[in-house]
From Swiss-Prot:
Belongs to the YejK family. Transmembrane segments: none annotated. This is Nucleoid-associated protein PBPRA2585. InterPro entries: Nucleoid_associated_NdpA. Keywords: Cytoplasm. GO terms for molecular function: double-stranded DNA binding; single-stranded RNA binding. The keyword Ligase does not apply. It is found in: Cytoplasm, Nucleoid. NCBIfam families: PRK00378.1. The keyword Cytoplasm applies. GO terms for cellular component: bacterial nucleoid; cytoplasm. The lineage of its organism: Bacteria, Pseudomonadati, Pseudomonadota, Gammaproteobacteria, Vibrionales.
């Protein structure tokens, strides 16, 4: 991985006997050796591969943003910037009941001609190691794979387009733990681009375009499949859905209007590009539902052919069950009888 490290520093956050957060600040950056470069490269790789990221931008009165500007313009050194940030994080952590100890990692680096600032509170795990004398010894390590209190700022995007609503990304916390909320408070940032909402708007625009173009059932299915294939391809490649590029993959309406022109004229609030959402995409080609002890999943093309839904009686009828399911049903019926 091509990565150039500028600065990296660690600060320790611990809990005392009174369950209060204490901080141990480091007074100098780490040496840029193979160990630190390896750590930052792994942080970058793991963070980039994680799903469920949110997008944000700094609030107008963000103190953190002000410090970052001071650092980037040379008015403040990296150690001072990181120390002030760590102290602010300590204050924010104290407000939340789920506050956890950990190691605050702040790293400034460049990857693929883009400057980044990584900020993460990494959990420390206890383990055992074998010494050179073949003795067992306790050891601690940073659990990079399980990090979830993390944000990354695209410094290049932030400095060239401060009006962007997506230069700051963060990992959304697990349900019931408002991790992302507290980390946004720490950075004094507000939620920006909503990727899930963008995907939902795109799916609705696809359905509306099909209806407006008066496509028959088979043509609609083919159109949805083309949209799915493009979006899934972008997802697999790690690229974003580009609406104009997608329109180039799709046939235009009878009057010559392409999908991009349709979304623009109809006022769909779609960004030029955004990350694909697997759950939203799946609805283009499948019907999926679960509840009441049932889980149902079938290709949308089967609706009206082998699977029929009666809205008045809320009844789903399946003609021709899968062989393995049929075998299970017959075995159970024979056993019960």
């Amino acid at each position: 991985m091509s990565l150039t490290l500028s600065n990296v520093i660690l600060h320790q956050l611990t809990k005392n006997d009174q369950d209060e957060i204490e901080i141990n600040l480091r007074n100098q950056v780490l040496d840029a050796d193979s160990s630190t470069e390896g750590l930052v490269a792994e942080l970058h790789r793991v963070y980039s591969s994680k799903g469920a990221k949110g997008f944000a931008l700094f609030a107008e009165d963000s103190e953190f943003c002000h410090w970052l500007k001071q650092y980037r313009t040379g008015e403040m050194d990296f150690v001072t910037f990181s120390n002030q940030s760590a102290q602010r994080l300590q204050v924010e952590l104290a407000k939340y009941p789920f506050a956890e100890a950990g190691t605050l990692v702040m790293a400034e680096y460049q990857s693929l001609a883009t400057d980044y600032l990584f900020i993460g509170l990494l959990p420390t795990c206890h383990s055992m190691k074998v010494t050179e004398q073949l003795d067992i010894s306790a050891t601690d390590y940073l659990d990079v794979a399980k990090m979830d209190i993390v944000a990354r700022i695209d410094l290049s995007s932030w400095e060239t387009n401060s009006d962007s609503n997506r230069y700051l990304t963060f990992i959304k916390g697990r349900v019931g733990r408002k991790i992302s909320d507290f980390f946004l408070d720490f950075l004094q940032a507000v939620v920006g681009l909503d990727a899930k909402e963008q995907n939902q708007v795109l799916m609705q625009a696809v359905e509306d375009f099909c209806a407006d173009s008066r496509l028959d059932k088979e043509e609609k299915q083919q159109y949805r499949k083309q949209v799915y294939d493009y979006c899934n391809g972008q997802l697999q490649a790690g690229d974003e859905v580009a609406v104009k590029e997608l329109a180039g993959e799709l046939p235009p309406a009878e009057d010559g209007t392409n999908f991009y022109e349709f979304t623009s004229k109809q006022g769909y609030e779609l960004e030029e590009s955004f990350p694909a959402d697997r759950t939203a995409m799946r609805k283009l080609t499948k019907f999926v539902g679960a509840g009441g002890g049932m889980s149902i999943n079938f290709d949308s093309m089967l609706l009206g052919e082998r699977i029929f839904y009666d809205a008045e009686t809320d009844t789903l009828t399946i003609k021709g069950t899968p062989p393995n399911l049929k075998d299970q049903l017959l075995r159970r019926l024979n056993t019960d009888n």
